[in-house]
Amino acid sequence: MRFFVPLFLVGILFPAILAKQFTKCELSQLLKDIDGYGGIALPELICTMFHTSGYDTQAIVENNESTEYGLFQISNKLWCKSSQVPQSRNICDISCDKFLDDDITDDIMCAKKILDIKGIDYWLAHKALCTEKLEQWLCEKL
């Protein structure tokens, strides 16, 4: 029983260590190098990520035919591999679980592929919520 408690705590705390809830300014700093990528301004991307995942790297949304993972809500139907959809095209050549940690380097690489192939409207929140009045999504600290 003595060993159960420490192992239990590790099991609870370890995933929390890997997760990251970003702020608008933290995310703006990390994504500043892709400002203008695919014709998308940084405030549009920051707005879209807020309405898509709430800046949470562990966000998971289950739909009827697929699941979306992480900060960019990347679908296992086309972009990443999961046991739920073994026939995924896995265009980004990555396990979907990799989008749930605090290292967003691979998330950004896959998001750029999505932008290249589908454009910003892949993320439904963009068209509905992030095409005007974008000044609120600017970070003053950049």
Curated annotation (Swiss-Prot):
Listed GO MF terms: calcium ion binding; lactose synthase activity; lysozyme activity
Tissues of expression: Mammary gland specific. Secreted in milk.
Signal peptide (from-to): 1-19
UniProt entry keywords in alphabetical sequence: Calcium, Disulfide bond, Glycoprotein, Lactose biosynthesis, Metal-binding, Milk protein, Secreted, Signal, Zinc
Glycan attachment sites: N64, N90
Subunit: Lactose synthase (LS) is a heterodimer of a catalytic component, beta1,4-galactosyltransferase (beta4Gal-T1) and a regulatory component, alpha-lactalbumin (LA).
One record GO biological process: lactose biosynthetic process
Predominant subcellular localization, coarse grouping: secreted
Binding site residues for Ca(2+) 1: T57, Q58, L100, D102
Family under the similarity heading: Belongs to the glycosyl hydrolase 22 family.
Name of this protein: Alpha-lactalbumin
Keyword tRNA processing included in the entry's annotation: no
SUPFAM superfamilies: Lysozyme-like (SSF53955)
Positions annotated to bind Zn(2+): E68, E135
GO CC annotations on file: extracellular space; Golgi lumen; Golgi membrane; protein-containing complex
Paired cysteines (S-S): C25-C139, C47-C130, C80-C96, C92-C110
Domain C-type lysozyme: from-to ranges: 20-142
Organism of provenance: Homo sapiens (Human)
Role of this protein: Regulatory subunit of lactose synthase, changes the substrate specificity of galactosyltransferase in the mammary gland making glucose a good acceptor substrate for this enzyme. This enables LS to synthesize lactose, the major carbohydrate component of milk. In other tissues, galactosyltransferase transfers galactose onto the N-acetylglucosamine of the oligosaccharide chains in glycoproteins.
